């Protein structure tokens, strides 16, 4: 990890900017995770309450996967200060990414495949048999396909553990229904392990089948678009890590263009730093660098943007107004709750 406010050479700065601004991949470390503290604490609260589980949902691009990624380091960090040493010793935090072809059993097999037992203690990660490890499913003598009761019995022996299923919106409806049954069962038996479901959805009902039957057993975490001050934290973090300074005008411009979506803050922030390097103006980043960044970001996604524009405006009717309507939407003053 680079020291705070360390000055880098221009070439190093252009390279290191990509370690702080990460538009292509979700954030995976707590020190680069900005905003969403309230939502993260809500997940931690669910972990600390037996029988309670969490569902993280919202539109695409608001940072759901990044939030899911920092659950593990946050929980493990809190363990250092928590009083429940027994749970902390046995706790594991495991994540998998669901696919459209996944069943209830295949998802849990993927989660359990990462866990081995050594001297009756769960350990996450690949290791050789020489270490005396025993795969979790082998230790419990459970065969595929796994049932709700199979999973319940295993989780009962992993107190305080967290199992995260990302992209849950992709699973078949039948799989979603079985997860609802599992959460209800875990709650009824007060099993002290937490299931966290993450997916793209406007409402929890679109993501979790028959959610009304488990409403008391789930903490519903809707990820709204980020507030301007939360997006500004991303830029503040970059300033400390890279030793650069965004002018107030540049920072406000980036935040406004991002429209609450952290992906764009990372994307424009990255190219702004590199634009400043090319202009020979680091560590100061001004509005001109932001405009150059927009040109570069647009250039890199030009073909996909053209394709989306073509699909949105195509019509067999000459009098269709799709193009001017789309242009009007683009130039209209954007507000957080604006229908546009």
Language model features: what each stretch is:
Residues 269-340:
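Winged-helix-like regulatory helical subdomains adjacent to P-loop NTPase cores
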Residues 179-190:
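Conserved catalytic/switch belt of AAA+ P-loop NTPases
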Residues 45-177, 191-194, 201-203:
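P-loop NTPase nucleotide-binding core
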Residues 223-250, 263, 268:
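Conserved small helical "lid"/interfacial subdomain of P-loop NTPases
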Residues 180, 245-257:
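Short conserved motifs of the RecA-like P-loop NTPase core
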Residues 203-218:
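Short regulatory helix/loop adjacent to the ATP-binding pocket of P-loop NTPases
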Residues 252-256, 263-278:
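C-terminal helical "lid" of AAA+/P-loop NTPase domains
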Residues 1-54, 73-79, 84-86:
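A short, basic N-terminal segment
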């Amino acid at each position: 990890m680079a020291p705070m406010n360390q000055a880098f050479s221009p070439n190093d700065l252009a390279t290191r900017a990509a370690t702080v601004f990460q538009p292509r991949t979700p954030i995976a470390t707590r020190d680069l995770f900005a905003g969403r503290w309230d939502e993260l604490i809500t997940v931690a609260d669910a972990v600390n309450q037996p029988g309670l589980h969490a569902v993280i949902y919202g539109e695409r691009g608001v940072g759901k996967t990044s939030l899911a990624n920092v659950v593990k380091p946050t929980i493990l960090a809190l363990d250092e200060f928590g009083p429940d040493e027994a749970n902390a010793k046995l706790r594991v935090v495991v994540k998998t990414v669901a696919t459209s072809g996944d069943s209830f059993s295949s998802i849990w097999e993927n989660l359990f495949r990462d866990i081995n037992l050594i001297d009756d203690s769960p350990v996450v990660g690949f290791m050789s048999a020489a270490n005396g490890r025993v795969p979790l499913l082998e230790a419990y003598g459970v065969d595929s396909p796994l049932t709700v009761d199979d999973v319940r019995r295993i989780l009962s022996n992993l107190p305080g553990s967290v199992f995260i299923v990302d992209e849950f919106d992709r699973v078949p409806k039948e799989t979603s229904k079985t997860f609802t049954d599992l959460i209800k069962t875990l709650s009824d038996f007060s099993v002290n392990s937490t299931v966290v479901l993450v997916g793209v959805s406007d409402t929890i009902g679109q993501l979790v089948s028959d959610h009304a039957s488990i409403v008391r057993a789930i903490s519903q975490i809707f990820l709204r678009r980020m507030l301007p001050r939360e997006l500004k934290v991303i830029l503040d973090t970059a300033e400390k890590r890279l030793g650069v300074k965004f002018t107030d005008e540049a920072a406000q411009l980036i935040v406004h263009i991002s429209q609450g979506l952290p992906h764009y803050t990372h994307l424009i922030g990255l190219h702004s730093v590199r634009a400043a390097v090319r202009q020979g103006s680091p560590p100061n980043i001004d509005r001109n660098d932001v405009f150059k960044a927009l040109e570069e970001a647009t250039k890199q996604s030009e073909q996909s943007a053209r394709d989306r524009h073509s699909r949105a405006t195509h019509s067999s009717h000459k009098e269709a107004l799709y193009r001017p309507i789309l242009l009007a939407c683009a130039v209209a003053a954007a507000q957080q709750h604006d229908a546009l």
